[in-house]
Amino acid sequence: MGQLGALLHLVDPTLPIGGFNHSNGLETFVQQGKVNSRASLEEYVQTQLMQNWIYNDGAYLSLAFDAMANHDLDRLLALDQELAASKIARESREGSYKLGVRLLKIFIRYENHPLLSEFQQAVSEKRCQGYFPIVFAMVAQAMNLDKAETLYAFYYNAAVGVVTNGVKLVPLSQMDGQDILFALRTPLAQAVENSLNPDLDWLGAATLASDIRSMQHEQLYTRLYMS
């Protein structure tokens, strides 16, 4: 039960890290009319999951989890730098490391793991940024969480964020949002399976439409979100 409690704490939407402030380009898709219904929002989330997250944030989380288990700080720093290079849009890039730094600040108070302290020192010395998936993986491994369950929780948390924002932006009913999350159960499980041992040849695969909308977000006339 202790691991379940730790995992629920790690993905608690009330964590004061500011995740609710970011749409990562979804707001642009909605304003351009690309996402305008339950069906299009569900398609958007599944596309992000299976064509973006499993090759980017999820893949780097998986690799960072293994590096943390091997007590390999150099590998963690390298993964953080590689992830930075894969995040083309400034708002999404800055949003990710701000979330990561805040997450680290919270959990370093509870987990007495030397690599967390060393990584925090590396962030303060600007040897890395501290991107959210990297920190998430480090904290999860420090708490001895199961890797597959950590990945599922990470993906589910990301999906909930997208659906919550989409319901607000389109707008849709709350039940539409719940129906989308229910439909994601099988794709989420498949994403976890694909991410346990990431294909390095696909690491950092670009999702151009999403990257472009994330960059266009900076120029929107009105915005509810920071990215």
From Swiss-Prot:
Transmembrane stretches, start-end: none
UniProt keyword annotations, A-Z: Chaperone, Cytoplasm, Nickel insertion
GO molecular function: nickel cation binding
Annotated Gene3D superfamilies: Urease accessory protein UreF
Disulphide connectivity of cysteines: none
Major localization class: cytoplasm
Locations listed in the record: Cytoplasm
The organism's place on the tree of life at top rank: Bacteria
GO cellular component terms listed in the entry, alphabetical order: cytoplasm
Pfam families linked: UreF
InterPro entries: UreF (IPR002639), UreF_sf (IPR038277)
Family: Belongs to the UreF family.
HAMAP family, A to Z: UreF (MF_01385)
Function text: Required for maturation of urease via the functional incorporation of the urease nickel metallocenter.
Subunit structure: UreD, UreF and UreG form a complex that acts as a GTP-hydrolysis-dependent molecular chaperone, activating the urease apoprotein by helping to assemble the nickel containing metallocenter of UreC. The UreE protein probably delivers the nickel.
UniProt name for this protein: Urease accessory protein UreF
Organism: Actinobacillus pleuropneumoniae (Haemophilus pleuropneumoniae)
Gene that produces this protein: ureF
